[in-house]
């Protein structure tokens, strides 16, 4: 049985008739292969998947509501929130984290590139997981008959798993960085990591031994509120994200979130200045940290915008 190659090399009838002639030449028909376009691999197109956007859209209303209660009327948490929070500085600190969360998840809805928001998901998982753990550790401190308590409990039991799931799934679409993309310098990366180490270390102390931390904390805290503040500080693990992805485009969103949080914390410290014990070093350290985030973040955002402009437009 003739193979396909035999058919491609078979001579024409005219050639076959003259195959005995020495002058006859066999002409072979070329085997032309058409090029087939290979579709782009969808798993590396850097898009934000629908489940990720849906989760972001579902979380935003809860964060907005929590922010309005805790920041606008922090003295009414006993009647409006999952548990009465005192003093108001703690309520406003948690509200500042919610404000940063709103900014982050709105960015998730708006962006078309997964890598620009990817590093923000692990901190959310840690934050929500720690608040869920604090809820069960201090179950008796909550107002069980209030709808806000059940919303709080459901949110912080479910959210860590949902956020972790969408992050793991959406990571499959991550595209590699282009060679010419602007990146952070070595010293800037070290500053990010150092800030993360300080924030997370203090957060871990508050989560593990809140009673001990209360002796040095700038305002009055309980075991529950100490662990809540610790969860907020553990959002600092976002600083470690530069070890995985140090592109400006991957970092700028996290810087914006940090600046939003720092702005509201600074205002809260002014509003609750009578609650803060300014003779404690951590009070001034917190003020310095907030200032560093606002100033350093502003400088970095300016550099990022400059790097995005064409060379001829830079000054």
What do these predicted regions represent?
Residues 32-47, 171-187, 312-315:
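Membrane-interfacial, low-structure loops and terminal tails that flank and connect transmembrane helices
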Residues 49-68, 174-246:
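Surface-exposed interaction/gating patches
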Residues 72-78, 136-143, 207-214, 270-276:
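Juxtamembrane "helix-exit" motif on the non-cytosolic side of transmembrane helices
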Residues 100-175, 264, 268-271, 278-307:
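Hydrophobic, ordered structural segments
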Residues 59, 121-130, 185-198, 255-264:
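Transmembrane alpha-helical segments of multi-pass membrane proteins
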Residues 39-120, 215-218, 282:
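An N-terminus-focused feature that recognizes amino-terminal "leader" regions
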Residues 89-106, 126, 224-244, 260:
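Core segments of alpha-helical transmembrane spans in multipass integral membrane proteins
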């Amino acid at each position: 049985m003739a193979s396909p190659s035999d058919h491609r090399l078979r001579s024409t009838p005219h050639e076959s008739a003259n195959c005995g002639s020495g002058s006859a030449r066999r002409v072979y028909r070329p085997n032309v292969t058409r090029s087939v376009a290979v579709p782009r691999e969808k798993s590396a197109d850097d898009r934000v998947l629908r489940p990720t956007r849906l989760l972001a859209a579902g979380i935003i209303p809860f964060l907005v509501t929590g922010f309005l209660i805790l920041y606008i009327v922090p003295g009414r948490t006993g009647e409006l929130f999952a548990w009465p929070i005192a003093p108001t500085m703690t309520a406003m600190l948690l509200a500042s984290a919610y404000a940063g969360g709103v900014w982050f998840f709105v960015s998730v809805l708006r962006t078309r590139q997964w890598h620009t928001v990817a590093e923000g998901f692990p901190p959310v998982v840690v934050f929500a997981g720690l608040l869920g753990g604090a809820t069960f550790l201090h179950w008796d401190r909550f107002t069980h008959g209030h709808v806000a308590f059940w919303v709080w409990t459901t949110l912080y039991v479910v959210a860590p798993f949902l956020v972790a799931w969408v992050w793991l799934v959406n990571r499959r679409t991550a595209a590699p960085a282009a060679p010419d993309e602007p990146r952070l310098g070595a010293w800037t990366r070290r500053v990010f990591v150092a800030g993360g180490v300080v924030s997370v270390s203090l957060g871990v102390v508050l989560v593990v031994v809140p009673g001990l931390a209360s002796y040095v904390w700038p305002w009055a805290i309980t075991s529950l509120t100490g662990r809540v503040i610790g969860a907020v500080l553990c959002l600092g693990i976002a600083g470690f994200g530069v070890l995985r992805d140090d592109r400006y485009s991957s970092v700028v969103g996290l810087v914006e979130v940090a600046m939003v949080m720092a702005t509201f914390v600074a205002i809260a410290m002014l509003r609750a200045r009578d609650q803060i014990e300014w003779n404690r070093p951590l009070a001034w350290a917190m003020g310095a940290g907030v200032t560093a985030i606002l100033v350093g973040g502003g400088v970095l955002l300016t550099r990022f915008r400059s790097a995005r402009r064409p060379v001829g437009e830079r000054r």
